């Protein structure tokens, strides 16, 4: 079983596409800046660490209104 689960992650964001975009951007940021918001993570990969941050409520996403 994956941790965090897709169900718990979907409660944090509005769609799977948003989840992929936010986690990929955060993973890339962690690779470049070598920083993470959670000290002890289960995952050793950047995308997994980003998903754990989303699950912990440390990352969020707000849509801009397009006019």
Swiss-Prot record:
Keywords: DNA-directed RNA polymerase, Nucleotidyltransferase, Transcription, Transferase
GO terms, biological process: DNA-templated transcription
SUPFAM superfamilies the record matches: RPB6/omega subunit-like
EC numbers, comma separated: 2.7.7.6
GO CC entries: DNA-directed RNA polymerase complex
Membrane-spanning segments: none
Listed SMART domains: RNA_pol_Rpb6
Enzyme superclass (EC): transferase
Molecular function in Gene Ontology: DNA binding; DNA-directed RNA polymerase activity
Substrates-to-products reaction catalysed: RNA(n) + a ribonucleoside 5'-triphosphate = RNA(n+1) + diphosphate
InterPro entries per the UniProt record, alphabetical: DNA-dir_RNA_pol_omega, Pol_omega/Rpo6/RPB6, RPB6/omega-like_sf
Family in the record: Belongs to the RNA polymerase subunit omega family.
Subunit text: The RNAP catalytic core consists of 2 alpha, 1 beta, 1 beta' and 1 omega subunit. When a sigma factor is associated with the core the holoenzyme is formed, which can initiate transcription.
Its biological purpose: Promotes RNA polymerase assembly. Latches the N- and C-terminal regions of the beta' subunit thereby facilitating its interaction with the beta and alpha subunits.
The name this protein goes by in its record: DNA-directed RNA polymerase subunit omega
Gene name in the database record: rpoZ
């Amino acid at each position: 079983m994956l941790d965090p689960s897709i169900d718990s992650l979907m409660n944090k964001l509005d769609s799977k596409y948003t989840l992929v975009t936010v986690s990929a951007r955060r993973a890339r940021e962690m690779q470049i800046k070598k920083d993470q918001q959670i000290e002890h993570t289960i995952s050793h990969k950047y995308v997994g660490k980003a998903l754990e941050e989303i699950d912990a409520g440390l990352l969020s996403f707000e849509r801009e209104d397009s006019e």
